[in-house]
């Protein structure tokens, strides 16, 4: 039986031009082109950081994993929102005769909002898939963060006052309402690293970053809001974007530009440990998580009738959403129902999955 590993990431613009960024942004918005001012802002951010190394770094990570596991698995790489796209790579895998595939998403934590979005592309009548849901507890990855933060504390902070700010990509607040494990995983991940460092609860905190302006509330506190709200600052802030593993715009701009600029304004020293990128400890974590999971059940992913963002649910789904107060239905869903009428509301795919997980909706 021919087996493969499919390493997947979010993607990035294929070229840093206005239209290159527009194409990428349009893919993120599921084919709806953002307004020009939104594209211009994102384009300017890419220009500010000199482009993005994400694709280069990810391909290097793939090569390093292949060097360790290539005798047993064919290793492929795909992006969610840029070339090579996941469906195209799956097509190539089918042509290569692959029958089983371990899906290794290069995001350590599981979220309904993000990771589930990869699963909808896993359509093949030939290939059975095994999706590794999360791998943030891998000891090698925890050691990486602890070691790199410890270097900053020893070499740069020394005896000065400091605070470690663990940040993670925010998610819409309805993810919390419906029991998304992501938030708890981020807190646990931060605590595990802090314990390795011997940090007290006063020496570190959790914040969120990189939320999108799509008209719905996101998990707080935002890292920039957190900084502005502090009445007193330590001598040093150490920013640890723990939900990411590679340098890309949400680290190089959101942290290294926006957080840095605020630190300059407040007279605080800014620090950020290097991202794992191609470090051997990250590769150890990726290889080990494959080993730990490779004997689990593979299954066929059939195409969903609904997509991640466009779902016309059954009347039962709509009724449950409208009538179950204990689900803490997000305000934007209530407003949609009030404005359009229950029969006309399109619910996000992930809300249906959250309802199933909460036992409020039987799996079909």
UniProtKB/Swiss-Prot annotation:
Swiss-Prot/TrEMBL catalytic activity: Fe-coproporphyrin III + 2 H(+) = coproporphyrin III + Fe(2+)
Highest taxon, organism lineage: Bacteria
Binding site for Fe-coproporphyrin III: 29, 118
EC main group: lyase
CDD domains, A to Z: Ferrochelatase_C
Disulfide bonds: none
Protein purpose: Involved in coproporphyrin-dependent heme b biosynthesis. Catalyzes the insertion of ferrous iron into coproporphyrin III to form Fe-coproporphyrin III.
Official protein name in the record: Coproporphyrin III ferrochelatase
Organism of derivation: Streptococcus pneumoniae serotype 2 (strain D39 / NCTC 7466)
Gene: cpfC
């Amino acid at each position: 039986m021919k087996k493969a590993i499919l390493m997947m990431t979010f993607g990035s613009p294929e070229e840093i031009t206005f239209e290159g960024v527009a194409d990428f942004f349009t893919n993120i918005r599921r084919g709806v082109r953002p307004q020009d001012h939104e594209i211009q802002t994102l384009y300017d951010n890419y220009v500010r950081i000199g482009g993005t190394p994400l694709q280069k770094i990810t391909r290097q990570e793939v090569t390093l994993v292949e060097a360790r596991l290539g005798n047993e698995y064919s290793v492929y790489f795909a992006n969610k929102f840029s070339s090579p796209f996941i469906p195209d790579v799956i097509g190539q895998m089918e042509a290569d005769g692959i029958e089983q595939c371990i899906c290794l998403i290069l995001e350590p934590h599981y979220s309904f909002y993000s990771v589930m979005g990869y699963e909808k592309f896993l359509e093949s009548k030939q290939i059975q898939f095994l999706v590794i849901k999360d791998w943030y507890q891998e000891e090698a990855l925890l050691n990486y963060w602890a070691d790199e933060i410890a270097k900053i504390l020893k070499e740069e902070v020394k005896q000065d006052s400091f605070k470690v700010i663990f940040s993670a990509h925010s998610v819409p607040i309805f993810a919390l309402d419906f029991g998304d494990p992501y938030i708890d995983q981020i807190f646990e991940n931060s605590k595990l690293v802090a314990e390795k460092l011997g940090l007290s609860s006063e020496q570190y905190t959790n914040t969120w970053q990189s939320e999108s302006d799509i008209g719905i509330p996101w998990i707080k506190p935002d890292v920039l809001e957190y900084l502005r709200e502090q009445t007193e600052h330590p001598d040093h802030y150490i920013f640890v974007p723990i939900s990411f593993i590679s340098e890309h715009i949400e680290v190089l701009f959101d942290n290294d530009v926006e957080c840095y600029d605020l630190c300059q304004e407040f007279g605080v020293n800014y620090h950020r440990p290097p991202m794992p990128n191609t470090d051997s400890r990250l590769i150890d974590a990726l290889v080990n998580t494959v080993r730990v999971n490779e004997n689990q059940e593979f299954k066929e992913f059939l195409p969903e009738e609904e997509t991640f963002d466009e779902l016309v649910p059954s009347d039962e789904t709509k009724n449950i959403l409208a009538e179950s107060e204990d689900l803490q239905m997000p305000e934007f869903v209530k407003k949609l129902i009030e404005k359009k009428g229950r029969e006309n509301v399109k619910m996000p795919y992930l809300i249906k999955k959250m309802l199933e997980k909460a036992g409020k909706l039987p799996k079909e």
